[in-house]
Amino acid sequence: MEQIHGGDSNSGGGGGGSSRNDEISVTRASRFDALPEDCISKVISHTSPRDACVVASVSKSVKSAAQSDLVWEMFLPSEYSSLVLQSANHLSKKEIFLSLADNSVLVENGKKSFWVEKASGKKCYMLSAMELTIIWGDSPAYWKWITVPESKFEKVAELRNVCWFEVRGKISCGMLSKGTHYSVYVVFKTANGRSYGFDLVPVEAGVGFVGKVATKKSVYFESGNADSRSATSHYSGISYAMVSRAFRMRRPWMQVQREEEEEVEGERERGMNVVGPKERVDGWSEVELGKFYINNGGCGDDGSDEIEISIMETQNGNWKSGLIIQGIEIRPERSN
């Protein structure tokens, strides 16, 4: 397909070589353009949505073929008809595709959100907080279920105060696109712009196939500026800095906690397997939890048929609060 788009990108700035390459490209484009439209559509349908948009610029006849329902139905998920309103039946398949790419659809009683990646047509999901297993999530003293207008879902989970932080989720491999590398993110924000207890102590994230050893990493919900780190290292609401060294020496477990914090700080400074948050265009933040691959058989290489995701901090005993979790997002890994 490269020959359709123009001359040799490695050629010099001018001269006979460039003209020769352009002539070859035009000739080959003309030959492709001379094919019957349904034949052109068949070829394009085996590429990607991005490629279809690119080749549409070759000529009017190729554009017509590239925008045909034959092409865009191949890019749509097989279950698309159940995901769109009946009022959308008059739309072309390309318009339906773009609608699913630009606007996510709530599925499974509003507990999941579905859309397709515009460039590839790959399936994407967000598991709402209601779909996750949150330890103490049904105890109002620890977690509160609230409504926020900027969320995709009816309810999100607000962390009030816990020392045992554990969130888990699962998704079936069959719901995702085959032959695809996926990345997993937790989507969150902080209550009143601030959380407590997540600055010095990392959270352990795990992603893997059920029944297999998960790939783990340390993640932070806070960006990690020095002022925030020094102000909010808490144990039961008491700043660690307020506890004397002599007092800690009489309680070895507190010394271990401090050593773990210093080790994590060293990892963060060295840029090791520690990941921080990034802001999203929708006003939320996200942290990457891990990656996995769905093979061409629609499952893991070991035959597993379900992905499990975990986010935990249960070792240090420090109190944590102020986090609002919208859900866990699973989308194709971005290629560079």
Curated annotation (Swiss-Prot):
<comment type="pathway">
    <text>Protein modification; protein ubiquitination.</text>
</comment>
<protein>
    <recommendedName>
        <fullName>F-box protein PP2-B1</fullName>
    </recommendedName>
</protein>
<keyword id="KW-0539">Nucleus</keyword>
<comment type="subunit">
    <text>Part of a SCF (ASK-cullin-F-box) protein ligase complex. Interacts with SKP1A/ASK1 and SPK1B/ASK2.</text>
</comment>
<feature type="domain" description="F-box">
    <location>
        <begin position="29"/>
        <end position="75"/>
    </location>
</feature>
<dbReference type="Pfam" id="PF14299">
    <property type="entry name" value="PP2"/>
</dbReference>
<dbReference type="InterPro" id="IPR001810">
    <property type="entry name" value="F-box_dom"/>
</dbReference>
<feature type="compositionally biased region" description="Gly residues">
    <location>
        <begin position="9"/>
        <end position="18"/>
    </location>
</feature>
<dbReference type="GO" id="GO:0016567">
    <property type="term" value="P:protein ubiquitination"/>
</dbReference>
<comment type="function">
    <text>Component of SCF(ASK-cullin-F-box) E3 ubiquitin ligase complexes, which may mediate the ubiquitination and subsequent proteasomal degradation of target proteins.</text>
</comment>
<dbReference type="InterPro" id="IPR025886">
    <property type="entry name" value="PP2-like"/>
</dbReference>
<feature type="region of interest" description="Disordered">
    <location>
        <begin position="1"/>
        <end position="22"/>
    </location>
</feature>
<dbReference type="GO" id="GO:0005634">
    <property type="term" value="C:nucleus"/>
</dbReference>
<dbReference type="InterPro" id="IPR036047">
    <property type="entry name" value="F-box-like_dom_sf"/>
</dbReference>
<dbReference type="GO" id="GO:0030246">
    <property type="term" value="F:carbohydrate binding"/>
</dbReference>
<keyword id="KW-0833">Ubl conjugation pathway</keyword>
<dbReference type="Pfam" id="PF00646">
    <property type="entry name" value="F-box"/>
</dbReference>
